[in-house]
Amino acid sequence: MLTNYAFIGIFALAAITFPLLPLVLSAFLRPNRPTPVKLSTYECGLEAIGDIWVQFKVQYYLYALAFVIFDIETVFLYPWAVAYGQLGLFALFEMVVFLAILTIGLVYAWKKGALEWI
């Protein structure tokens, strides 16, 4: 049993080490010579016109967050629907509770005006 956890620990350590090692090495090995040309904004081969930073409205983020939440809901709902015949009545109750919590959250967001578009 402990050897299974050792394999998971080694895999997790490798998953953290392999991406971070090149980043740390490149920070130490690359030349650091900032010039005004390197710090200038470059857009399609031309100098940027107007303000470089574009501010998005908060509503975009709220819609994106709602989409991610309900997208994850489908990730949980699909395996449940596939294996429903083997899971029984208790799994149905758990999924009803899960969907009720999400529905309450959707109604709350709707009442607060988070889904209103400007």
From Swiss-Prot:
Main localization (coarse): membrane
EC number: 7.1.1.-
Record has Repeat as a keyword: no
Localization in the cell: Cell membrane
Matching Pfam families: Oxidored_q4
Reaction(s) the record says it catalyses: a quinone + NADH + 5 H(+)(in) = a quinol + NAD(+) + 4 H(+)(out)
Keywords, in A-Z order: Cell membrane, Membrane, NAD, Quinone, Translocase, Transmembrane, Transmembrane helix, Transport, Ubiquinone
Mode of membrane association: Multi-pass membrane protein
Keyword NAD: yes
GO molecular function (one): NADH:ubiquinone reductase (non-electrogenic) activity
Segments crossing the lipid bilayer: 5-25, 62-82, 87-107
GO cellular component terms attached to this protein's record: NADH dehydrogenase complex; plasma membrane
Function statement: NDH-1 shuttles electrons from NADH, via FMN and iron-sulfur (Fe-S) centers, to quinones in the respiratory chain. The immediate electron acceptor for the enzyme in this species is believed to be ubiquinone. Couples the redox reaction to proton translocation (for every two electrons transferred, four hydrogen ions are translocated across the cytoplasmic membrane), and thus conserves the redox energy in a proton gradient.
Subunit structure: NDH-1 is composed of 14 different subunits. Subunits NuoA, H, J, K, L, M, N constitute the membrane sector of the complex.
UniProt family annotation: Belongs to the complex I subunit 3 family.
PANTHER family noted in UniProt: NADH-UBIQUINONE OXIDOREDUCTASE CHAIN 3
Protein known as: NADH-quinone oxidoreductase subunit A
Organism per entry: Herpetosiphon aurantiacus (strain ATCC 23779 / DSM 785 / 114-95)
Gene name linked to the record: nuoA
